[in-house]
C-alpha cells in the first residue's frame, strides 16, 4: 500500500497487512471463544471453531460502496494500491497465520485463557475470506482455496456476486470454497443501485448472472441477507415476495438473515445509526415471512439471538460441515 495514512488508519482498527493487497484481523468471536465466553453463529450452525478461524482477505479493493458496510468504503483504495504486484497464494496463507499468531500473543498471559484452544489457534483451520474488499477480484483466488484445501483447512468465501465468470472458473477447476456466500441486500434494480453504489457497469445484471449459475456450483451455498430498518429499509413487507423469487432462482442450501449492526464506518452514514438496527424479534419475524414465501423444503433451521441471525434452509441434518466437504 502506497499511502501510509490509509494503512495507519486501518492498522489502528486492528487490520494487519499481508503482502501488497492482503489483510487479516482477529474477529471478536475468536477472542471470546478463547476465553470460553461465546462462539460465532457460524460455529453453532456449521461446526467451525471460532477460536481457530482466520478472518482475512487476499484483496482489499471492492467495486461497491454499500451503505451498510462497516468497512472504510469512504477511503478510495484504488489510488493507493499497486495492482500489478500480485501476492502469491502460499505466501498470503503463511503471512496470515504469522500475523494471526502475533495478534494472539497478548492472550498468552491471560489466566482466563483456554490453553488448549490457544494452542490450536496457532494453526487456524478455518479461513473466512470476507474481511475487506472483494476476493473474487484476486487473480489467484482458486490457487489460494486449493492450498487451503490441501492443508485440510475449511474456507468460507463471501462475494458480492459481480464476477460470475470467476465463480464458473472456480467451479470448472474444482477450486470452490467449502462454503460460498453471495450477499443479497436488495430485491430490485432500483434499490440495488441505491444500496450498493457500484462502480461496475450493469452491476444488477451481473449479480443476477451469478444467481443464475449458483445452482450448478458444486459446493455448499448460502445467500446472506443484512436487514436494515428506517429510511434505508430493505425489510419492507412488500419486498418479501421479490426476495423469495431471487432466492428460488439461486436455489441455495441456506439463507442467513442477519440484522444490521451500526458499527465501524457505517455509523457515520445518514440513516445508519442505532435506529437502523432491527431487533432479533424483527429479524426473526421477517425471516418467517421469507421462509413462508419460499415454501417447502425451506424452513427456519436455527437462530443465534445475540448476533441477530436466523438460518433458513432445506435440511437441518446438513448444517454441520462433514470431512468430505472441506
Descriptions of predicted regions:
Residues 1-60, 64-68, 72-102:
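Flexible, acidic/Gly-rich N-terminal and inter-domain linker regions that tether
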Residues 108-281, 285:
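Conserved AdoMet/S-adenosylmethionine-binding subsite of the radical SAM
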Residues 65, 75-78, 189, 263-266, ...:
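Short catalytic/ligand-binding loop motif for oxyanion handling, primarily in non-cytosolic enzymes
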Residues 8-11, 15-19, 37-40, 53-55, ...:
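Accessory C-terminal segments flanking Radical SAM cores
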Residues 56, 95-120:
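Long, charge-rich boundary regions
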Residues 51, 122-124, 304-307:
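Short Gly/Ser/Thr- and Asp/Glu-enriched loop/turn motifs at secondary-structure junctions
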Residues 248, 280-326:
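C-terminal accessory regions of radical SAM enzymes
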Residues 48-62, 249-261, 289:
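Short, solvent-exposed linear motifs at loop/edge-of-secondary-structure regions
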Amino acid at each position: 500500500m502506497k499511502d501510509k495514512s490509509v494503512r495507519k488508519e486501518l492498522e489502528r482498527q486492528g487490520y494487519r497487512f499481508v503482502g501488497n493487497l492482503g489483510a487479516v484481523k482477529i474477529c471478536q468471536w475468536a477472542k471470546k471463544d478463547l476465553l470460553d465466553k461465546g462462539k460465532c453463529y457460524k460455529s453453532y450452525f456449521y461446526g467451525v471453531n471460532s477460536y481457530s478461524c482466520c478472518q482475512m482477505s487476499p484483496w482489499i479493493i471492492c467495486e461497491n460502496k454499500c451503505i451498510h458496510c462497516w468497512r472504510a468504503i469512504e477511503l478510495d483504495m484504488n489510488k493507493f494500491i499497486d495492482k500489478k504486484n500480485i501476492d502469491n497464494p502460499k505466501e498470503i496463507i503463511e503471512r496470515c497465520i504469522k500475523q494471526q499468531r502475533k495478534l494472539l500473543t497478548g492472550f498468552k498471559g491471560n489466566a482466563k485463557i483456554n490453553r488448549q484452544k490457544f494452542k490450536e489457534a496457532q494453526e487456524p483451520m478455518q479461513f473466512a475470506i470476507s474481511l475487506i474488499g472483494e476476493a473474487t477480484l484476486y487473480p489467484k483466488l482458486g490457487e489460494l482455496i486449493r492450498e487451503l484445501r490441501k492443508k485440510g483447512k475449511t474456507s468460507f468465501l463471501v462475494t458480492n456476486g459481480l464476477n460470475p465468470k470467476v465463480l464458473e472458473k472456480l467451479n470448472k477447476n474444482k477450486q470452490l470454497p467449502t462454503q460460498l456466500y453471495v450477499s443479497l441486500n436488495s430485491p430490485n434494480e432500483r434499490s440495488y443501485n441505491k444500496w450498493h453504489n457500484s462502480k461496475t457497469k450493469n452491476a444488477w445484471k451481473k449479480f443476477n448472472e451469478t444467481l443464475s449459475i449458483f445452482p450448478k456450483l458444486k459446493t455448499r451455498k448460502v445467500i446472506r441477507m443484512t436487514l436494515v430498518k428506517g429510511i434505508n429499509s430493505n425489510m419492507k413487507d412488500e419486498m418479501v415476495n421479490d426476495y423469495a423469487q431471487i432466492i428460488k432462482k439461486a436455489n441455495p442450501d441456506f439463507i442467513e438473515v442477519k440484522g444490521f449492526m451500526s458499527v465501524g464506518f457505517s455509523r457515520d452514514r445518514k440513516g445508519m445509526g442505532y435506529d437502523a438496527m432491527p431487533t432479533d424479534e424483527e429479524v426473526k419475524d421477517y425471516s418467517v415471512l421469507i421462509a413462508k414465501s419460499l415454501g417447502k423444503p425451506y424452513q427456519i433451521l436455527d437462530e443465534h439471538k445475540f448476533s441477530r441471525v436466523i438460518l433458513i434452509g432445506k435440511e437441518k441434518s446438513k448444517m454441520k460441515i462433514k470431512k468430505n466437504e472441506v
